[in-house]
Amino acid sequence: MENYQDYECQEVKSIHELYFETVARHAEEVAFEYSAGVVTYSELNERVLHAAGRMVPYQGKQVFIGVLDPLKFAIAYFSCVLSGCVAVLGAPDDYDVFQKSGGNAQLCITDSNVFDGSAGKVPLGAYSVSDTDAVCTILHSSGTEGAPKWVMLSHANICSNIVSGLRKYLMRQVDVFYNIIPYYHAFGLVCDFLAPLFVGAKICVPDKKELFFSQMAIFCPTALNVPPAVAMRLSHYISVAGSAAAVTGGRLKKILCGGAGLAAEISKRLREQGINALGCYGLSECSPCVSVNRDEFYKDGSAGIPLGCNDVSIGGDGEVLIRGTNVMKGYYGDEAETCRILSGGVLHTGDLGRIDGDGFLFITGRKKNVIVFDDGTKCSPEIYEAQIVAHTDAEEALIRIGNGQPMRLEALIYATDNSKQDEIRRYITDLDINKRISSVLFTNTPLPKNSLGKVQRNYEKR
């Protein structure tokens, strides 16, 4: 398998340019589809411009957007940015968090008060962007070291990431996407919202998130952007149903997994089921994508090859370092942390990784998760967790320091088949860190995760 020429993608420098190009080229195409009906790009534009008229008094100010519905989010986000406001994105209950952390949002928009209707329509192109390096979006992020942060992104950050991403990973106007990721997450905002709309694709929305799988065959998506945990569940449902078409509607050809690492075993299993599951790597601080596996140039278990908008290198201690036009402007209200993470224009991700001879990036762990034993040896638990999941019937694995036993580890395993516990124990016995593991615990329920499928390593033990 060899790399190939980039896909073509028009250059855009600002959200304004992206939006106006989109509605001009795809006016009569369907932008959003619900079970109750569809909304075309021209209809979306009418709603956005009316809403933008209501946003004019807030020009230059912060506006918090805690909207979950995709169409309402589109109206709120585009009207906010087009009007020259700074969109602050988060879950609905993050508004107070932002304000208490030094935020100065003058307006809070939720699903119940999105501006829509006939008031105050703004003419197309009434506002332009004089400085594409100006901050247009602030995202709530866990931060590279786990502490919640507010990431400031500019027009140039976001647009360079979209364009570079579309040159490596194919999205087409004929594609049908199916939403489950909140758009207040960077992966959702860029990969599942802005990029699909930029190419004129259709975004379908289930009646409820809980109906995502049961309604999938109704909408017949061609592509998904989901966390690995969702990809794993999809593979399971396909196995139970006996065919991918019975679950997906028969048109799903590929999945892009972000937010957490995609295990090689899951990619292989889905490919055997007729779906190309590809992993990528990113951080909110990088707008968010850093690397991606291409449609016809990929390595299972890898994070893909770097996008053209950034340079990726590995530091002396194995840390992944990034420099590029997609790297954030900084953390809002935290100059000290910004200076610590961004040194000389280089983002210190806190992730450990390596780049192979073909240019593929592999993420091997987190610096903060490395366990240092009393004899000076070190362990990256993510490496062993991935091995356990890949080579046994364990659905999920978590290795961490055990209670009351300094420098002794415990392995917590989620496995749905209790009869496989002895087999999993035997595999763990053969690992080179087995002598460090004092206990292997099993659970019949999935390990707690955040909304993008990352296991919460420090949750309270049950």
Predicted stretch roles:
Residues 324, 330, 352-435:
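AMP-binding/adenylate-forming catalytic core of the ANL superfamily
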